[in-house]
């Protein structure tokens, strides 16, 4: 009888990536098949996020529901991973004894052994260590699920912003070898992937080893990824302003595969608050980066993160944030009311901004950015946009839908063979959350660049260094 696995994922795109790898790994080692119904599962996994307030309480609330399932089926295995698991460790089992497996973001590759341990000994296992890059060497080959794919290039963060738990839950920055990344992307391209999104907590800090012992910078990696035949669109997230160097900006100038859209978190427009956050840059320095980016790529759109109501934030601080929003003309944002995270320096600061004031400020900021986004959408009417067709439209199954470089959904009339390919459309109308387009040309009529085939990358000879890290050599 087929064993079934249910995974509940909370949090960022990195968590989504990790969960997909867990599913592939356990399918290859134990034959687990995914199910959306927890009651059907033989194994329940919760991949957690600790960025937002009350993350732990959400975890224990769901575990309370899963406990009832385990009472009905004592053979059911329950595992908790991700950042809350990394933070809580053994304490998590003290509050929820029904949990059998506790693993951190860097130890998900050990899940098969942990599950075998539970099945063989009927005793729990906890592994929240930080074994650096080992996780990537033990995960199964990538599997494409449509024309877009996420690829993790690094883990962790060294910045220790005062509000953030990432360095404590995912560890410090560790970069994957560049050849491993290119090999994975070439495999995905061979399966029909056309767009890759490079993932990391701080991708522009990437410094990966090459097969000849050199170091590959993030700018170099972007060019190498863009050169793989079949990969015609490259994205990345997330970046830190202090490492957004000129060589990365130069890639925007000469590499058309890199999209005209950038998510660059700033958090606040107030230099005083930025200092308290330990962001290590000013609002003016942030704007200087954006100015240079727009010189290199005039049509680039910018999104960002904002924390509203950070301890000590005054009305003047908030007004400076709103000035930055207008000056940069952000297209979209992930904006939240500040919530203290246990163990971070900011958690010890007096939170002297009222909840009502925080909510009001957040509403003002989100309303302004929504207004700017609509203005940008209206400016796209009459322009020609290249979109990657992802499938049928959610609004009309007789139509297709795809995304522009700046992440707008475009609905248009087309034929099924266009799915997974690029088309050029003219934007003719704007709606609240999408655009309307008219087909102008298909991929067969485009002059897409070809540099290196996926097969030529895959054909490289694999060698392993003394640490067992795979290297690929021509």
From Swiss-Prot:
GO CC aspect terms: cytosol
Ranges for domain Radical SAM core: 143-375
General function of this protein: Catalyzes the methylthiolation of N6-(dimethylallyl)adenosine (i(6)A), leading to the formation of 2-methylthio-N6-(dimethylallyl)adenosine (ms(2)i(6)A) at position 37 in tRNAs that read codons beginning with uridine.
PANTHER family reported in the protein's UniProt record: CDK5 REGULATORY SUBUNIT-ASSOCIATED PROTEIN 1 (PTHR43020), MITOCHONDRIAL TRNA METHYLTHIOTRANSFERASE CDK5RAP1 (PTHR43020:SF2)
A Pfam family that the UniProt record links to this protein: TRAM
Keywords linked to the UniProt accession: 4Fe-4S, Cytoplasm, Iron, Iron-sulfur, Metal-binding, S-adenosyl-L-methionine, Transferase, tRNA processing
Binding site for [4Fe-4S] cluster 1: 12, 49, 83
EC numbers on record: 2.8.4.3
Name of the featured protein: tRNA-2-methylthio-N(6)-dimethylallyladenosine synthase
InterPro entries (alphabetical): Elp3/MiaA/NifB-like_rSAM (IPR006638), Methylthiotransferase (IPR005839), Methylthiotransferase_CS (IPR020612), Methylthiotransferase_N (IPR013848), Methylthiotransferase_N_sf (IPR038135), MiaB_methiolase (IPR006463), rSAM (IPR007197), rSAM_horseshoe (IPR023404)
Residues annotated to bind [4Fe-4S] cluster 2: 157, 161, 164
Species of the source: Yersinia enterocolitica serotype O:8 / biotype 1B (strain NCTC 13174 / 8081)
Family assignment from sequence similarity: Belongs to the methylthiotransferase family. MiaB subfamily.
Essential cofactor(s): [4Fe-4S] cluster
């Amino acid at each position: 009888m087929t064993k079934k696995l249910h995974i509940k994922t909370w949090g960022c795109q990195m968590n989504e990536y990790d969960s997909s790898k867990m599913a592939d790994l356990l399918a290859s080692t134990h034959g687990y098949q995914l199910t959306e119904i927890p009651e059907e599962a033989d194994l329940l996994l919760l991949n957690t996020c600790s960025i937002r307030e009350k993350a732990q309480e959400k975890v224990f609330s769901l575990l309370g529901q899963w406990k009832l399932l385990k009472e009905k089926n004592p053979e059911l295995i329950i595992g908790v991973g991700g950042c809350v698991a990394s933070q809580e460790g053994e304490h998590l089992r003290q509050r929820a004894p029904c949990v059998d497996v506790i693993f951190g973001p860097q130890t998900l590759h050990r899940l098969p052994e942990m599950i075998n341990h539970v099945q063989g000994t009927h005793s729990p296992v906890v592994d929240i260590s930080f074994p650096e890059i080992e996780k990537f060497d033990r995960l199964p080959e990538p599997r494409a699920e449509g024309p877009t794919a996420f690829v993790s290039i690094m883990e962790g963060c060294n910045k220790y912003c005062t509000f953030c738990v990432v360095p404590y839950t995912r560890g410090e920055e560790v970069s994957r070898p560049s050849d491993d990344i290119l090999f994975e992307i070439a495999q995905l391209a061979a399966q029909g992937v056309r767009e890759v999104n490079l993932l990391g907590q701080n991708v522009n800090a990437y410094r990966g080893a090459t097969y000849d012992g050199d170091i590959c910078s993030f700018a170099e990696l972007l060019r190498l990824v863009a050169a793989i035949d079949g990969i015609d669109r490259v994205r990345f997230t997330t970046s830190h302003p202090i490492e957004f160097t000129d060589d990365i900006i130069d890639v925007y100038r000469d590499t058309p595969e890199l999209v005209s859209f950038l998510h660059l978190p700033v958090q606040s427009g107030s230099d005083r608050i930025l200092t308290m956050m330990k962001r290590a840059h000013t609002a003016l320095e942030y704007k200087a980066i954006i100015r240079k980016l727009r010189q290199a790529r005039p049509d680039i759109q910018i999104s960002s993160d904002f924390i509203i109501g950070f301890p000590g934030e005054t009305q003047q601080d908030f007004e400076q944030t709103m000035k930055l929003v207008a000056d940069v003309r952000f297209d979209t944002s992930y904006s939240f009311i500040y919530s203290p995270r246990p163990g971070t320096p900011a958690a010890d600061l007096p939170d002297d901004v009222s909840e009502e004031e925080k909510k009001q400020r957040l509403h003002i900021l989100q309303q302004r950015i929504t207004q700017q986004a609509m203005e940008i959408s209206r400016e796209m009417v009459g322009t020609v946009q290249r979109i990657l067709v992802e499938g049928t439209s959610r609004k009309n199954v007789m139509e297709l839908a795809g995304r522009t470089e700046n992440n707008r959904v475009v609905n248009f009339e087309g034929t099924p063979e266009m799915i997974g390919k690029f088309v050029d459309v003219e934007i003719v109308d704007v709606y609240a959350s999408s655009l309307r387009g008219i087909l102008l040309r298909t991929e067969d009529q485009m002059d897409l660049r070809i540099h290196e085939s996926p097969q030529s990358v895959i054909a490289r000879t694999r060698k392993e260094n003394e640490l067992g890290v795979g290297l690929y050599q021509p």
